[in-house]
């Protein structure tokens, strides 16, 4: 992938950009083999990759510069701003949004936040696009509610220019730290969720719910999990760390009893909306801590699917799963190192299948899906 920002030395986020996609896949596969060394694997499935550019459905832009000439991108450690509007990871549909937002910021009087001076209001712009219908969600991350009236007054102009903006919010993040968002979300549109669809499964994206940033590869990840579960004798399943329900909604059947657990209420609201659309009455989602939920249960499902954050599921949940002993575990991980550690805490399970998904091209990161079967 060619990138003028990288060539000019202005951005180094894509550290592997000089390598071909095949070289990147080989290096990631070797890393996964190294991390799982000593753990017998019955089947290594071929890695899955997608487009090498224009694949991201989300932009997280630091806003700097002045209200008349804002910059969208990032700040180097020395505070130097870099405009990333031309980043080739973003789809072409983002460019007109960025170019329209720059004069809008002046029109609304949203002074960019100055980190050194601790002054200004607009900290970040968070833009998400649906691959289903091209609808977009835009979040203005503000230091306070001071400019909220001005923002509301200017919105009709913005929505006339960019009708694809279906969901618009103001997120209030008052802390002088590099934190992307605060707890308070103020909706500026009637619509509060963005419609998405993977493999004919309806999904919803709300402002504070996690959603994969590479929809092409994510849709194949969910489809693969569905295929694996479909080959197993599963009538009762848990989906832990379920997010908006992508895995559970793909794997569920009308006959299956499935419980999805996620600590973020916004994500659970999305999952419940999707389940209602699909008419799956035996599928239940709850906003709880996944580990606490599992430990409190007195029943054992046939399969437990876990999709934890980078820290992994941790030893307490591993110990409980080992004690509870479901017949199958599917582990989806964005950090193979912690996944490998967790699997080693499950001595009574054997790895039946492993598949790498190149969710993050041009970086060392990848997603991995692993099927574990109880051996005793």
Curated annotation (Swiss-Prot):
Keyword tags: 4Fe-4S, Iron, Iron-sulfur, Metal-binding, Methyltransferase, rRNA processing, S-adenosyl-L-methionine, Transferase
The positions flagged as active site in the entry are 334 (nucleophile)
| Annotated EC | 2.1.1.189
Domain of life, per UniProt, equals: Bacteria
Provide the catalytic activity annotation: uridine(747) in 23S rRNA + S-adenosyl-L-methionine = 5-methyluridine(747) in 23S rRNA + S-adenosyl-L-homocysteine + H(+)
Name the Pfam families on file. tRNA_U5-meth_tr (PF05958)
Per UniProt, where does [4Fe-4S] cluster bind? Answer: 3, 11, 14, 87
Q: Which principal EC class is assigned to this enzyme?
A: transferase
Q: Which PROSITE patterns match?
A: SAM_MT_RNA_M5U, TRMA_1, TRMA_2
Q: Which GO terms describe its molecular function?
A: 4 iron, 4 sulfur cluster binding; iron ion binding; rRNA (uridine-C5-)-methyltransferase activity
Instruction: List the GO biological process terms.
Output: rRNA base methylation
The residues listed in the UniProt record as binding S-adenosyl-L-methionine, with positions renumbered to this chain, are 212, 241, 262, 307
**What InterPro entries does UniProt report for this protein, alphabetically?**
23SrRNA_MeTrfase_RlmC, MeTrfase_TrmA_AS, MeTrfase_TrmA_CS, SAM-dependent_MTases_sf, U5_MeTrfase_fam
Q: Does the keyword Transcription regulation apply?
A: no
Q: Which family does it belong to?
A: Belongs to the class I-like SAM-binding methyltransferase superfamily. RNA M5U methyltransferase family. RlmC subfamily.
According to its UniProt entry, the function of this protein is described as: Catalyzes the formation of 5-methyl-uridine at position 747 (m5U747) in 23S rRNA.
Which protein are we looking at?
23S rRNA (uracil(747)-C(5))-methyltransferase RlmC
């Amino acid at each position: 992938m060619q990138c003028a920002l990288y060539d000019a030395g202005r951005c180094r986020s894509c550290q592997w950009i000089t390598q071909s996609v095949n070289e990147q896949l080989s290096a990631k596969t070797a890393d996964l083999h190294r991390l799982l060394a000593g753990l017998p694997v019955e089947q290594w499935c071929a890695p899955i990759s997608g487009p090498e550019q224009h694949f991201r459905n989300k932009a997280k832009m630091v806003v700097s510069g002045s209200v008349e000439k804002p910059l969208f991108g990032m700040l180097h450690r020395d505070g130097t701003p870099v405009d990333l509007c031309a980043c080739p990871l973003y789809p072409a549909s983002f460019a007109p949004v960025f170019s329209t937002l720059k004069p809008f910021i002046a029109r609304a009087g949203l002074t960019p936040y100055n980190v050194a001076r601790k002054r200004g209001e607009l900290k970040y712009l968070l833009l998400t696009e649906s691959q289903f219908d091209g609808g977009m969600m835009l979040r203005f991350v503000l230091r306070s509610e001071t400019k909220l009236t001005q923002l509301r007054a200017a919105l009709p102009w913005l929505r006339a220019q960019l009708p694809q903006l279906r969901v618009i919010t103001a997120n209030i993040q008052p802390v002088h730290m590099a934190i992307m968002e605060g707890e308070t979300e103020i909706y500026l549109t009637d619509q509060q969720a963005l419609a998405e669809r993977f493999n004919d499964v309806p999904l919803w994206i709300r402002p504070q719910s996690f959603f994969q940033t590479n929809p092409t590869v994510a849709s194949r990840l969910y489809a693969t999990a569905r295929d694996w579960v479909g080959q197993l004798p599963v009538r009762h399943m848990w989906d832990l760390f379920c997010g908006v329900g992508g895995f559970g909604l793909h794997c569920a059947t009308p006959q299956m009893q499935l419980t999805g657990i996620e600590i973020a209420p916004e994500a659970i609201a999305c999952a419940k909306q999707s389940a209602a659309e699909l008419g799956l009455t035996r599928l239940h989602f709850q906003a709880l801590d996944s580990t606490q939920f599992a430990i409190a249960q007195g029943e054992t499902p046939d399969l437990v699917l876990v999709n934890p954050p980078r820290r992994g599921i941790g030893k307490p949940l591993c110990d409980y799963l080992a004690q509870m002993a479901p017949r199958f575990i599917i582990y989806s991980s964005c950090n193979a190192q912690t996944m490998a550690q967790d699997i080693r805490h499950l001595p009574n399970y054997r790895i039946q299948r492993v598949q790498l998904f190149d969710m993050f091209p041009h970086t060392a990161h990848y997603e991995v899906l692993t099927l574990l079967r109880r051996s005793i």
